[in-house]
Regions:
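Conserved beta-strand/loop subsegment of P-loop NTPase cores
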Residues: 29-35, 53-65, 84-88
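Walker A (P-loop) phosphate-binding loop of P-loop NTPases
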Residues: 94, 134, 145
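Active-site phosphate-binding and catalytic loops of NTP-dependent enzymes
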Residues: 11, 18, 39-42, 109-117, ...
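Switch I (effector-binding) loop of TRAFAC-class P-loop GTPase G-domains
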Residues: 13-16, 119-122, 145-172
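Switch II of P-loop NTPase G domains
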Residues: 2-29, 35-51, 68-74, 158-164, ...
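Canonical P-loop GTPase G-domain recognition
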Residues: 65-130
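Glycine-rich phosphate-binding P-loop
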Residues: 127-142
Length: 197
């Protein structure tokens, strides 16, 4: 499948991104990938599939209210056929995010059970949050934290340092790990299209 985006990844960006993701993958239990539902494939990091491999992952197709409903459904089916869990949402309003933590709990059920048997019930599940600028990653983290943990703005890459965010759902603790500094070269027209509504 294809969409209409035009994002260029240069060797320097690729190297930096790969290093950041590889470092964080070692300390997390799963990956949360934020994309723009209007251009889901173009708003993905192209090296993520190779890096994540067998690590549990969920894609949040953000800004779903601005996307074509039929196209979103087809993209959701496309990713699910590849074994990736998908939720549609709007991170700024919170629409659809009530399903996120229950979905993560289901996705990591085996890990939760193993920890329970080891007496590690209170150990937080660690989730790495990834997404290129302007897909709504900061809005997602702020919404989950119920407070403003990260800066939200139109300038690409406003989140530059690793940020840790604690959240909880039905007694289960979650630690969101946001790796900053991932800045591809985004076409100006596409960037304007992707900016927060």
């Amino acid at each position: 499948m294809n969409d209409v985006g035009n994002i260029q990844w240069f060797p320097g960006h690729m190297t930096k991104t790969k290093r950041l993701i590889e470092a964080d993958l070692k300390m997390v239990d799963a990956v949360v990938e934020i994309t723009d539902a209007r251009i889901p494939e173009s708003s993905r990091n192209p090296i993520l599939d190779d890096l994540v491999k067998d690590k549990p992952r969920i894609i949040l197709m953000n800004k779903c209210d601005y996307a074509d409903e039929n196209a979103t459904r087809l993209w959701k089916q496309y990713y699910e056929k590849r074994g990736i869990r998908v939720l549609t949402c709007d991170c700024r309003s919170g629409k659809g995010l009530n399903r996120f933590l229950p979905e993560v709990k289901t996705m990591l059920a085996d890990l939760i059970e193993r920890r329970k048997k080891r007496g590690m019930i209170g150990k937080a599940l660690r989730l790495m949050v990834v997404g290129i600028p302007n897909v709504g990653k900061s809005s997602f983290i702020n919404r989950m934290a119920k407070t403003k943990k990260t800066k939200v703005g139109d300038k690409p890459g406003v989140t530059r340092d690793r940020i840790f965010c604690d959240c909880e759902w039905c007694g289960h603790k979650f630690l969101l790990v946001d790796t900053g500094g991932i800045e591809p070269n985004i076409d100006d027209g596409l960037l304007a299209h992707m900016r927060e509504q």
